[in-house]
């Protein structure tokens, strides 16, 4: 029993003599005093900060603040109050600016970053926090800085806090507005009062203001370093760090910029748009990168350049070998930054996004690209048209796309006239370049328009084509489809004796078993359904295009793999894309009544006029140029607008005097073709040889009439493509 009592007494004594809990405030103050005492006692000015205990003590102070916050809950703890009242952050900022001991600014930025990121309660709106943060921001981005990594981490922490609470941006940007007031969990007034006039034991024994820090520095012989940087502020610094050769630094700076602008509050957007140089600096940087692209670059390399995303620049293998060519690094950096601008504009509040897009329009598009597109040098036109085409491919933000359309096409909405084509100079020049004496410029500019037609902006198609077709003045009023079929057939018969012998190629319906014709020739089987008239019209339209090319000029059925089933598949895919593109554009389902205005001659517009002129010369033009012209026209034909469909795909419309349609233009080409091939012996065999060469089945060899024969093959393929487009535009339930 005595032994049991002794053990019990021992345990009781142990419980009563527990070690008392650590006083966090005392420990916090001790660490801070140890740091300040270093400046009083040290005599070695060359000793690096990493060889002192300052970094360790700063880490201990941070740990105490984090632990205290977890224990205190909503209320600010005594250590945080001490940090604020004694302006510790202000003092650290001054010590960091002096770079004493050497490397101190690095430690200060790390401490600031961790305070902002680890402390959960908002503190950035407090005067004794945001003022030193402002000063530390102005120490970032200095020339030849050795602290880029720490600067980027610090700015990322600041931007993260701004993203969480956009209101604090007013403090960070030093924008004074008496109407901007808010309550805080810690009293600013109490902190200011305590820092300005009160005296406490802690304050008396611990230097806490910037003046105290300067006093410490003067005792130790160190002096604050003046900043040689002209442009200060968070945004200029972030864009300065974007140029860093260190990938992580550049990446983090751009992520910070994205955090800064991606606010849902319009007030923040107004603030960044009107009170900061963000928009101008972005445009300047993009322009700078564009001008770094060498003028001797090969346009073919740019055309084949795939779309890049700005974050891929910071991956280990940022540029693929397939995209490596002389000047590729400059091209790559430019398009990465263009993608970043797209992302910033999309994420920003509307007012800021529009302002950024307009800055890019003014400085980059109009200030740099336009003069190059309007110059006389063919080499310059070719390079910059290709760069613009690739830029169109990269642009995906609605606001920037709107500015691009305004830049290229203008804002005219009235129907075009032949007398007023120069209302928008760049639009006129670009369309004229589609008919340039240089085939390369023509091909490149046609590619530019093809890229433009794939963008989700209704003004593009309206400006280029639809505004000239909306009144249907290309069509004689009061004419029926059946009468027009007879007229077109009569025109075909009169065109040539060959067409008279076989106007619609009845061999299409024979039992030869040609699999190439199966998909479209299955259509007559559905004429017995509930809507036979619709099917009859579609079948007639499809066969009208299929039968345009005379039999002796057809070769697709003679070479395996040249059928039009592929065209049907491709047309269906493109039609789905175009339908999705225009879903919200509220296009009419059917064409409206013809407006009869005999005093006004129909003009298809500058763009279609050039395209029709080009297709009329298909037998005389280079193969690559023909491919591009037909590609643009087939893209236009796919769009589900009733007027556009009627004008490009209906063979039976009764055209008004002087008007031409795509089908009537092709009929004239066929008439020219019939005359030309009469003088060529074994024309079908020659065409088969050329077709096999184009398909890569045979090696290339010189053949007489090469341009003409290639033109015939493109013509046949184009007619098959238009037939496929007409077929896939049938309602799904009717196919």
Curated annotation (Swiss-Prot):
What name appears for this protein in its UniProt entry? Answer: FHF complex subunit HOOK-interacting protein 2B
Q: Which InterPro entries match?
A: FHIP, FHIP_C, FHIP_KELAA_motif
Q: Which family does it belong to?
A: Belongs to the FHIP family.
List residues traversing the bilayer: none
A Pfam family (short name) is: RAI16-like
Map out region (Disordered) in residue numbers: 183-229
The superkingdom of the source organism is Eukaryota
Q: Where is the composition biased (Low complexity)?
A: 196-221
């Amino acid at each position: 029993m005595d032994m049991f009592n002794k053990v019990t007494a021992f345990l009781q004594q142990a419980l009563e003599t527990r070690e008392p809990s650590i006083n966090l405030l005392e420990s916090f103050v001790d660490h801070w005093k140890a740091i300040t005492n270093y400046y009083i006692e040290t005599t070695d000015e060359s000793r690096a900060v990493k060889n002192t205990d300052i970094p360790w003590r700063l880490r201990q102070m941070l740990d105490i603040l984090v632990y205290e916050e977890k224990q205190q809950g909503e209320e600010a703890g005594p250590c945080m109050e001490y940090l604020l009242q004694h302006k510790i952050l202000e003092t650290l900022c001054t010590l960091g600016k002096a770079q004493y001991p050497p490397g101190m600014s690095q430690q200060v930025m790390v401490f600031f970053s961790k305070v902002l990121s680890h402390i959960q309660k908002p503190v950035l709106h407090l005067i004794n926090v945001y003022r030193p943060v402002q000063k530390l921001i102005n120490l970032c981005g200095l020339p030849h800085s050795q602290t880029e990594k720490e600067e980027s981490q610090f700015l990322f922490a600041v931007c993260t806090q701004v993203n969480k609470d956009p209101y604090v941006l007013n403090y960070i940007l030093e924008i004074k507005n008496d109407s901007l007031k808010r309550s805080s969990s810690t009293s600013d007034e109490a902190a200011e009062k305590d820092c300005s006039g009160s005296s406490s034991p802690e304050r008396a024994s611990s230097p806490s203001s910037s003046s105290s820090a300067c006093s410490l520095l003067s005792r130790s012989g160190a002096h604050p370093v003046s900043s040689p940087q002209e442009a200060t502020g968070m945004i200029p610094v972030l864009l300065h760090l974007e140029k860093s050769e260190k990938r992580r630094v550049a990446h983090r700076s751009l992520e910070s910029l994205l955090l800064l602008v991606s606010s849902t509050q319009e007030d923040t957007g107004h603030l960044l748009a009107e009170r900061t140089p963000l928009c101008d600096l972005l445009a300047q940087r993009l322009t700078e990168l564009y001008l770094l692209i060498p003028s001797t670059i090969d346009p073919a390399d740019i055309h084949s350049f795939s779309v890049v995303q700005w974050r891929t620049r910071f991956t280990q293998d940022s540029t693929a070998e397939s995209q490596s060519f002389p000047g590729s690094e400059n091209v790559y950096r430019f398009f990465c930054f263009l993608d970043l601008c797209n992302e910033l504009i999309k994420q920003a509040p509307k007012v800021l996004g529009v302002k950024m897009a307009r800055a890019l329009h003014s400085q980059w598009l109009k200030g740099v690209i336009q003069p190059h597109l309007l110059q006389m040098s063919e080499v310059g036109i070719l390079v910059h048209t290709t760069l613009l085409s690739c830029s169109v491919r990269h642009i995906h933000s609605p606001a920037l796309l709107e500015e691009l359309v305004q830049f290229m096409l203008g804002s005219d909405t009235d129907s075009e006239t032949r007398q007023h084509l120069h209302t928008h100079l760049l639009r006129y020049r670009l369309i004229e370049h589609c008919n340039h004496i240089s085939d390369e410029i023509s091909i490149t500019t046609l590619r530019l328009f093809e890229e433009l037609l794939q963008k989700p902006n209704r003004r593009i198609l309206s400006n280029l084509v639809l505004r000239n077709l909306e009144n249907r003045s290309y069509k004689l009023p009061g004419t029926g489809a059946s009468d027009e079929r007879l007229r077109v057939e009569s025109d075909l018969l009169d065109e040539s004796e060959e067409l008279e012998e076989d106007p619609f190629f009845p061999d299409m319906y024979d039992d030869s078993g040609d699999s190439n014709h199966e998909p479209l020739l299955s259509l007559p089987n559905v004429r017995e359904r509930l809507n036979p008239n619709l099917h009859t019209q579609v079948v007639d339209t499809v066969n009208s295009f299929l039968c345009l090319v005379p039999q002796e000029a057809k070769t697709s059925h003679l070479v395996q793999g040249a059928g039009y089933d592929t065209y049907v598949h491709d047309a269906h895919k493109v039609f789905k894309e175009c339908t999705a593109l225009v879903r919200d554009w509220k296009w009419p389902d059917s064409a409206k009544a013809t407006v009869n205005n005999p005093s006004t001659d129909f003009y298809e517009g500058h763009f279609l006029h050039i395209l029709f002129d080009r297709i009329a010369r298909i037998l005389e033009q280079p193969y690559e140029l023909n491919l591009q012209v037909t590609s643009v026209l087939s893209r236009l034909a796919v769009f589900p607008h009733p007027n556009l469909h009627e004008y490009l795909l209906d063979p039976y419309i009764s055209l008004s005097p002087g008007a031409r349609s795509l089908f009537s233009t092709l009929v004239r080409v066929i008439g020219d073709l019939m005359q030309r091939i009469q003088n060529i012996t074994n024309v079908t065999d020659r065409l088969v040889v050329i077709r096999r060469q184009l398909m890569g089945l045979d090696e290339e060899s010189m053949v007489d009439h090469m341009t003409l024969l290639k033109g015939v093959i493109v013509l046949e393929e184009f007619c098959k493509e238009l037939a496929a487009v007409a077929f896939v535009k049938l309602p799904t339930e009717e196919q």
